[in-house]
Curated annotation (Swiss-Prot):
GO terms for biological process: leucyl-tRNA aminoacylation. This is Leucine--tRNA ligase. Its main location: cytoplasm. A motif ('KMSKS' region) lies at residues 627-631. GO terms for cellular component: cytosol. InterPro entries: aa-tRNA-synth_I_CS (IPR001412), aa-tRNA-synth_Ia (IPR002300), Leu-tRNA-ligase (IPR002302), Leu_tRNA-synth_edit (IPR025709), M/V/L/I-tRNA-synth_anticd-bd (IPR013155), Methionyl/Leucyl_tRNA_Synth (IPR015413), Rossmann-like_a/b/a_fold (IPR014729), tRNAsynth_Ia_anticodon-bd (IPR009080). A motif ('HIGH' region) lies at residues 42-52. CDD domains: Anticodon_Ia_Leu_BEm, LeuRS_core. It holds the Pfam family tRNA-synt_1_2.
């Protein structure tokens, strides 16, 4: 065994051994317990960042630990390879997105391998390859024929300069991010998944996921947004509107119906269109609303604006005339594009009514009383007894709901209804680098799905987009085709699918990545699925995780999988954060400096109190800790860390610095500490091995001192097993190993028993570290005399008899203050303990001249003598 620990050599040797033996390639083994551990696959952006390293290390520690428990562990990896960044990079560098993507995958794969991850690379999937997306197209055609996918007009952000559709996040202050042109709202035909058909099940089966963080389940519940309410119809005022009809609204607060003082409609509503005829000012306002953001989050924060129409509707119960307003806060796609406004009990209506001097009528007695003041109070939105509501006065929320519903049903002007916030999922993207939508538009037959024997519809890979619309729409060689039904000239769909589609089923494809008879091989899929442990960032809590759950149910209903949910347990890892440093630039902006280029000064408590740039020695401002990012220039390159310290040190630091679900603050001194610790383990093992391996430990002949050492070893095994196995608290498990190392380094090395005990301790340390620092553990295990590789060793078991203590040390307090210690046999009675405590030399000094009133004994811990 080399005297010096050289991570580069140790890690290369371990990785070569794993590659040669294909240590992580798994097959279905009926009868052996499976464990499917999956980290969210990366987008091949070019380089791994520390967030990736943390995510994949957490997954790897769990996978390796489960393997040590004797399970058949699947840990695959792939590439979420379609998407806009590739198009943007392609335009910037004048290179085809395919070339850019495949080069990035090659580089990032070598980076992942250098981390020593226990990945079955034979199952690698790349979503931009036809052998992957052909099955997505196959499922699309099946679902289209069943009506689960349909086509309708949808509102999009249209950039008139680039002639393209922009995502909400590409619209900055109403302008296109690339062209700077004012964005228009456009209606274009798009394809939609009927996810709303599954809304109830998606909501209810969250209760089948006890292994998910409550926070994520709450976010999904809110996103699905089930609300029970009432559909209320306000009859048209024929004098102003000119014809019969009713305005439908949905409300979750029908108890406040008697407080409605106006109604508001969306800019796209037919009543808005009618009112704008011959009213140029109203038409201009409607156009302004239509050009605003279509994102709900923006709507919530934007200024509430409205304009009166000359139209009125009638209150369904009183017949009173209520004015119709057009308002920018009403969404056409929620409810029916209209709301009844109750300013006294809804904050948004309250703001709007105050802005435009509309009446406010209180109809609920709240904790703030019967009246509503000029400033909004949260209490105004409470449920309470009805007032100013005629026959409904005195009723509570439920009583009013039922009575008002009955009154509306009698007049045929309302009924109770369940509503969801969730909308159907529009998947059409006017982009090039995505999965082609397998539809042919025929002038006679309409939309015809591409027949199975003509799949995949292959995306041409030698295209460099220019940002002006989709290049596919300008490629007759791509879109010109014949109708599969009637044989006439037809046109292929040039939109591609939302890239969330690829990541909604990849976890199932890993079970049979080379299967060529369907989306998945049902036998293999049901062998591995559902995923036992899924690991990824909280930012995917809603969209990705909801779409993946939806797709799993689609696959189940197609007979491909039998389970209801894709991921049994979910771990959302925290961010990696680091210090930021900047100087204010001449233009008022900030120039950010990488922490590696900054010299810092700390106070006695290690708090940073000053910072200077290394190049010029001048001060820089301290910006505080933030998530590692390019924009703040506070990232640390994982590759340089691996080259400097080795992968095991990086892995150890990341697992020790914080629990996996909390933010991890990068610290160079922490990395140094991890490196020092591994060198200590190596040194102790090297000195031990150099003397030749010892014989068997004779447990029956251990001295008291040796029993204490062995107790420390097995206490650490017990605690680490709980920390890793039950709670994923790798940081506290590592702390246990460090405690044992402190004991082993001080342990005497005189007798054969001493050396045999150290052997047991070093083996325990090696096994406990094996999932976290696999390379050094691989070498240590070999040097400690084992022929079988550490990856095939089992997790250490606790010898409970080693934890039994013959004697215990109790602290003795007098009136709550520590005054001494007594060592007692573990089986000593309460009376014996009390007598020993009273007669302790130091205790006698502090009780001299006092009367002992009471003695409290806490077995195994302390004795408190109360005296005065």
């Amino acid at each position: 065994m080399h005297e010096q620990y050289t991570p580069r050599d140790v890690e290369a040797a371990a990785q070569n051994a794993w590659d040669e033996q294909q240590s992580f390639a798994v097959t279905e083994q009926p009868g052996k317990e499976t464990y499917y551990c999956l980290s969210m696959f990366p987008y091949p952006s070019g380089k791994l960042h520390m967030g990736h390293v943390r995510n994949y290390t957490i997954g790897d520690v769990i996978a390796r630990y489960q393997r040590m428990l004797g399970k058949n562990v699947l840990q695959p990896m792939g590439w979420d390879a379609f998407g806009m960044p590739a198009e943007n990079a392609a335009m910037k560098n004048n290179v085809a997105p395919a070339k850019w993507t495949y080069e990035n995958i090659d580089y990032m794969k070598t980076q992942l391998k250098s981390l020593g991850l226990a990945i079955d690379w034979s199952r690698e999937v790349t979503t931009c390859k036809p052998d992957y997306y052909r099955w997505e197209q196959w499922l699309f055609t099946r679902l289209f024929e069943k009506g689960v996918i349909y086509r309708k007009n949808g509102t999009v952000n249209w950039d008139p300069a680039d002639q393209t559709v922009l995502a909400n996040e590409q619209v900055i202050d109403g302008r296109g991010w690339r062209s700077g042109a004012l964005i228009e709202k456009r209606e274009i035909p798009m394809y939609y998944f009927r996810i709303t058909d599954y809304a109830d099940e998606l909501l209810e089966s969250l209760d089948e996921l006890p292994g998910w963080p409550e926070q994520v389940k709450t976010m999904q519940r809110n996103w699905i947004g089930k609300s029970r309410g009432m559909e209320v119809q306000f009859p048209y005022d024929q004098a102003s509107i000119g014809h019969e009809g009713t305005l439908k609204v949905f409300t979750t607060r029908p108890d406040t119906l008697m407080g409605a003082t106006y109604v508001a409609v969306a800019a796209e509503h037919p009543l808005a269109t009618q009112a704008a005829q011959g009213n140029a000012a109203l038409q201009a306002f409607i156009d302004e609303c239509k050009s605003g953001s279509v994102a709900e989050a923006d709507m919530a924060t934007q200024e509430k604006k409205g304009m009166a129409t000359s139209l009125f509707v009638e209150h369904p119960l009183t017949g009173e005339k209520l004015p119709v307003w057009v308002a920018n806060y009403v969404l056409m796609h929620y409810g029916d594009g209209a709301v009844m406004a109750v300013p006294a009990h809804d904050e948004r209506d309250f703001e709007f009514a105050h802005k435009y001097n509309l009446p406010v009528k209180a109809v609920v007695r709240t904790s703030a009383g019967d009246d509503v003041g000029s400033e909004w109070l949260a209490a105004y939105g409470e449920h309470g007894q009805l007032i100013n509501s005629g026959e409904f006065d005195g009723l509570d929320f439920q009583g009013a709901f039922d009575a008002i519903e009955a009154a509306l049903i009698r007049k045929d002007l309302g009924k109770s209804r369940t509503q969801f916030r969730l909308r159907d999922w529009g998947i059409s993207r006017q982009r090039y680098w995505g999965c082609p939508i397998p539809i042919i538009h025929c002038p006679s037959c309409g939309d015809v799905p591409v027949p199975e024997d003509q799949l995949p519809v292959t995306l041409p890979e030698n295209v460099v987009p220019d940002g002006a619309g989709s290049p596919l729409a300008r490629m007759p060689e791509f879109y010109e085709c014949t109708c599969p039904k009637c044989g006439t000239a037809a046109k292929r769909e040039t939109d591609t699918m939302d890239t969330f589609v690829e990541s909604s089923w990849y976890f199932a494809r890993y079970a049979s990545p080379n299967y060529d008879k369907g989306l998945v091989d049902p036998k293999a899929a049901n062998h591995w699925l559902p995923v036992d442990q899924y690991i990824g960032g909280i930012e995917h809590a809603i969209l990705h995780l909801l779409y993946a759950r939806f797709f799993h149910k689609l696959m189940r209903d197609e007979g491909l999988v039998t389970s209801n949910e894709p991921f049994k347990n979910l771990l959302t890892q925290g961010m990696v954060v680091a210090e930021t440093y900047y100087r204010v630039a001449s233009n008022g902006g900030k120039d950010w400096f990488n922490p590696a280029d900054v010299e810092i000064e700390r106070d006695a408590k290690a708090k940073i109190i000053g910072a200077r740039l290394k190049t010029d020695g001048l001060p820089v401002e301290i910006g505080g800790t933030e998530k590692m990012s390019k924009s703040k220039n506070n990232g640390v390159d994982p590759q340089s860390m691996i080259e400097q310290y080795g992968a095991d040190t990086c892995r150890l630091f990341m697992m020790f610095a914080s629990p996996p679900d909390m933010s991890l603050e990068w610290s160079d001194s922490g990395v140094e500490g991890a490196s020092r610790f591994l060198r200590r383990v190596w040194r102790l093992a090297q000195a031990h091995v150099a003397q030749g391996l010892p014989g068997q430990l004779d447990i029956a002949a251990l001295s008291d001192e040796q029993k204490v050492i062995r107790r420390a070893i097995h206490a650490a095994i017990k605690q680490a097993s709980t920390d890793v196995g039950q709670f994923h608290k790798f940081n506290t498990a590592i702390a246990q190993v460090m405690t044992v190392m402190n004991v082993l380094e001080k342990a005497p090395q005189v007798t054969a028993q001493d050396r045999a005990l150290l052997q047991e301790g070093l083996e325990a340390v090696t096994l406990l570290l094996a999932p976290i620092t696999p390379h050094i553990s691989h070498e240590l295990w070999k040097q400690l005399g084992h022929e079988q590789a550490v990856i095939d060793a089992t997790w250490p078991s606790v010898d409970e008899s080693a934890l039994v203590q013959d004697t215990v040390t109790l602290v003795v307090q007098v009136n709550g203050k520590l005054r001494g210690q007594v060592e007692m046999p573990a089986a000593a009675s309460r009376e014996e303990i009390e007598a020993a405590a009273r007669n302790n030399e130091n205790v006698l000094r502090f009780t001299d001249g006092l009367t002992i009133r009471k003695v409290i004994v806490v077995p195994g811990k302390l004795v408190n003598i109360v005296a005065n």
